[in-house]
Amino acid sequence: MPLENYGPSGACLHEVIGADSPLLDVACQLFLKIFPEDHRYVPYVRACAQQRHPSHPNTFDHVWLVQQNDEWVGLRVFSYIVTREFGHGAYIGLLDNARGKGLGSWLVKQTLEQLNLDARQFGRSASIGYLVEVERAIDARSEADRLADERRLQFHRQCGGIILPVPFMEPVMIEGVSYIDSAALKDESPRPMHLMLIPSSTGAQRANLDIVDLVHGLYLDVYRLKEDHEFVRNALSSFVGDHI
């Protein structure tokens, strides 16, 4: 569990562990409320609750619920990439009535603390932070979507997020998973996204960031793409061997 279980306004974190957890259905139902457009990805949340699912060989996964005033109000899904020194933030979301109370930034802080614990568990001294894919406002289909995308980007920036200077395409799903049939995702398409690093205190002190390692960690180890995949090649076309 995170180092701090209680947060602003009486919020409390609960970790969902195991396919038989009584909280797993709660997490999936809340996921559908917060991210209705991603309903096809509920099996991914269920897989992450197992922490070391066979379809996620390179990650140690976490599913957290946020409870406030006896109501489930927030969800966090993220992973430590065991082959690297950083993690991947898949989902962070709150119900409308729980926003604007500091819960989002508190969840980010707890995520960074947990990733440090995970890093030590897997033989490293600390995590440098985690990667997150953020929608680009320029691609929004409506004014409401554009404003929502701008708010998400601003939130991650306020949490110290750095936009990495790479053209990033978000794959539809992790390659070769056993829990989602490709037919279920036939209407989904890869999306151009901002790729951001939310640095930990250790990561913020790094003089340089290894772009190749960060991109490889997400594309090769999380999404399980091949190194010669077009997404990988395009992202690194200007950065092979470079740091920032």
Enumerate the predicted regions with their spans:
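Terminal substrate-recognition subdomain of acyl/acetyltransferases
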Residues: 1-19, 120-244
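Short amphipathic alpha-helix that is part of the acyltransferase structural core
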Residues: 1-51, 59, 65
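Alpha-helix termini
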Residues: 52-57, 113-125
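Short beta-strand micro-motifs in enzyme catalytic cores
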Residues: 62-64, 85-87, 189-196
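Conserved beta-strand in the GNAT
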Residues: 65, 70-80, 88-93
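Feature marks short, surface-exposed loop/turn motifs that line or immediately flank catalytic pockets
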Residues: 82, 96-98, 138
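Conserved acetyl-CoA-binding loop-helix of GNAT-fold acetyltransferases
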Residues: 94, 100-119
